Swiss-Prot record:
Protein's name in the database: Aspartyl/glutamyl-tRNA(Asn/Gln) amidotransferase subunit C
InterPro entries: Asp/Glu-ADT_sf_sub_c, GatC
Catalysed reactions, semicolon-separated: L-glutamyl-tRNA(Gln) + L-glutamine + ATP + H2O = L-glutaminyl-tRNA(Gln) + L-glutamate + ADP + phosphate + H(+); L-aspartyl-tRNA(Asn) + L-glutamine + ATP + H2O = L-asparaginyl-tRNA(Asn) + L-glutamate + ADP + phosphate + 2 H(+)
Function in brief: Allows the formation of correctly charged Asn-tRNA(Asn) or Gln-tRNA(Gln) through the transamidation of misacylated Asp-tRNA(Asn) or Glu-tRNA(Gln) in organisms which lack either or both of asparaginyl-tRNA or glutaminyl-tRNA synthetases. The reaction takes place in the presence of glutamine and ATP through an activated phospho-Asp-tRNA(Asn) or phospho-Glu-tRNA(Gln).
Transmembrane segments: none
Signal peptide boundaries: none
Gene name of the encoded protein: gatC
Subunit structure: Heterotrimer of A, B and C subunits.
Keyword list, A-Z: ATP-binding, Ligase, Nucleotide-binding, Protein biosynthesis
Highest taxon of the lineage: Bacteria
Species whose genome carries this gene: Chlorobaculum parvum (strain DSM 263 / NCIMB 8327) (Chlorobium vibrioforme subsp. thiosulfatophilum)
Record-linked Gene3D superfamilies: Glu-tRNAGln amidotransferase C subunit, N-terminal domain
PANTHER family in the cross-refs: GLUTAMYL-TRNA(GLN) AMIDOTRANSFERASE SUBUNIT C, MITOCHONDRIAL
Amino acid sequence: MSVTTKDVAYIAELARLKFTDAEQERMTDELNMILHYVDKLNEVDTEGVEPLNTIHDQINVLRADVEHTPLSNEEALKNAPDRQDRFFKVPKVIG
């Protein structure tokens, strides 16, 4: 399997990307190199190798829940550059 410049142009169109002709050629070459590498991986003998689902044997390892005293409102706000009553005051971000 190989990728053509027509394939790259089609994928770029779907992704709403614009490439120059040089970029399109480079993308075509790079994608073909990747596919060639994947084809090489298909040649590897994996007979007797168990499929790997994760890279380690630990599943859902979570930290222990430790109860602690939360910050008071004053402690939380003491380094705030701006505040209003007991709330952080931030600049408007939606016009």
